[in-house]
Amino acid sequence: MAIHGDRDDELRLFQTGEHPCGYWSDRVARDLVLDPNDRRLGALYPLALSWGFRRSGDLVYRPHCAHCQACVAVRIPVARFAPDRSQRRCAARNADLEVRITAATARDDLFALYHRYLTHRHANGGMDDHGPHEFEQFLIGSWSHTRFMEMRLPGHDGQPSQLLGVAVTDVTEHGLSAVYTFFDPDHAARGLGTFAILQQIEWARREGLPHVYLGYWIRGHQKMDYKRRFHPLEAYDGRRWHDFDNDLDGR
């Protein structure tokens, strides 16, 4: 299908065939994908985020399933966000960490941590066999302005710092997009996933960016439910963004 402004400005969208759902093992899914050959992808990406799309590698997609509308695009309005008690405790628990924004380039230590994370947290989930090529293909876009937000335990007595987690983050003119976060499973008690989002919110504030996009919230999916703990949260209903409503957006 195509969305037309004028012929030279045509925005092409493709609908994929059905494929196994990445969230529910008993369901199939399909997506809408922006034309991956469109040279304007980098410029279109901020607008696509505002339409509920997401990036995976060089693909910009949005779920478009025939019989399921469980995936709800959500974002945090940075200016209105206030951490709750649990999130403040998480920030305090990780106050000893160094947070560094680095270039999105493949490194052996990053891949080793990514592989450990997938092996422990997503065993037999279809991603735990990723090699260095899949790591780069999945997380690093050729046209996106991507950065790695590294969370590190400082070194002492001449020892190097220890990499505990990485939040892959796209930087756009309208906000940050939290693409993927992985961390050392031995430090799961730190709540590094929550800490990463808190740091992305602070990053957006420093840059004067209005939103942090969290991808999709899915009712009843344990690994996605943490997103609604950030208040306020905005949800996209296919036409506009509005304050998240647990009953309404549960579809």
Curated annotation (Swiss-Prot):
Alphabetized InterPro entries for the sequence: Acyl_CoA_acyltransferase (IPR016181), Asp_Glu_LeuTrfase (IPR017138), N-end_Aminoacyl_Trfase (IPR030700), N-end_Aminoacyl_Trfase_C (IPR007472), N-end_Aminoacyl_Trfase_N (IPR007471)
The organism's place on the tree of life at top rank: Bacteria
Compartments where located: Cytoplasm
One BP annotation, GO: ubiquitin-dependent protein catabolic process via the N-end rule pathway
Alphabetical list of Pfam families matching this protein: ATE_C, ATE_N
Record key words, sorted: Acyltransferase, Cytoplasm, Transferase
Coiled coil regions, renumbered to chain: none
Protein function: Functions in the N-end rule pathway of protein degradation where it conjugates Leu from its aminoacyl-tRNA to the N-termini of proteins containing an N-terminal aspartate or glutamate.
NCBIfam families listed in its UniProt record: PRK01305.1-1, PRK01305.1-3, PRK01305.2-3
Family: Belongs to the R-transferase family. Bpt subfamily.
Full protein name: Aspartate/glutamate leucyltransferase
Source organism per UniProt: Stenotrophomonas maltophilia (strain K279a)
Lineage: Bacteria, Pseudomonadati, Pseudomonadota, Gammaproteobacteria, Lysobacterales
Gene name of the encoded protein: bpt
